[in-house]
Amino acid sequence: MKWLGNVLVSPGEGGVYGERTLDGYRVWDPYRSKLAALYTLGGGVELTPEMRVLYLGAANGTTVSHVADYVETVYAVEFAPRPMQDLLEVARRRRNIVPIMADASRPEEYAPFMEAVDLVYQDVAQPNQVEIAERNLVFLKPGGHLVLMLKTRSVDVRRDPAEVLAGARTGLEERLDIADVRWLDPYHHDHAAIVCSRRE
């Protein structure tokens, strides 16, 4: 990852969503991006030029555009029509983004467009967030990583966020090795990142 002092940046062409630039780099704001928050807090998976990433819950492509600055290919899955319009515009400026309009809980819908990936990044705020991540492990290479951004209030607004996180972790441990778990405060309240690796 590229840092200018304590500021996380990415090396692509700016102006994607009105982000600031610094010395020719795009500032990656942890208050706007949960992945940037994870890196700022000392966690995350290093993004490298040869990586292929499956990004679930691409939304309007803000974080996707930064990931694309670092890696070979980003398969960006989004289901909602309005954000998809913005994502398509981002993909026109980032040729290594493959926008896919599909339901992330049904990976069989986009399997024909996929190849094996090094990283699955899951940011779909649904009650079955863990299940969605697990269904998409079919695309993850052995030794690859899963980063799950858990929005605890979307899983169960009545339960304590720590309990929700513990349950998600237990579910993932059945198939993956947990590398890191951390809350994203102060950047994103009641959000936690779970970083896992697939067993060889």
From Swiss-Prot:
Keywords annotated in UniProt:
Methyltransferase, RNA-binding, rRNA processing, Transferase, tRNA processing
Q: Where is the signal peptide?
A: none
A GO biological process held by the record: tRNA processing
Enzyme Commission designation: 2.1.1.-
Q: Where is the chain membrane-spanning?
A: none
The entry's S-adenosyl-L-methionine-binding residues are T62, T63, E78, F79, D103, A104, D123, V124, A125, Q126
**Does the keyword field hold rRNA processing?**
yes
| Biological role | Involved in pre-rRNA and tRNA processing. Utilizes the methyl donor S-adenosyl-L-methionine to catalyze the site-specific 2'-hydroxyl methylation of ribose moieties in rRNA and tRNA. Site specificity is provided by a guide RNA that base pairs with the substrate. Methylation occurs at a characteristic distance from the sequence involved in base pairing with the guide RNA.
What protein family does this chain belong to? Answer: Belongs to the methyltransferase superfamily. Fibrillarin family.
Subunit structure and binding partners: Interacts with nop5. Component of box C/D small ribonucleoprotein (sRNP) particles that contain rpl7ae, FlpA and nop5, plus a guide RNA.
Name of the molecule in the record: Fibrillarin-like rRNA/tRNA 2'-O-methyltransferase
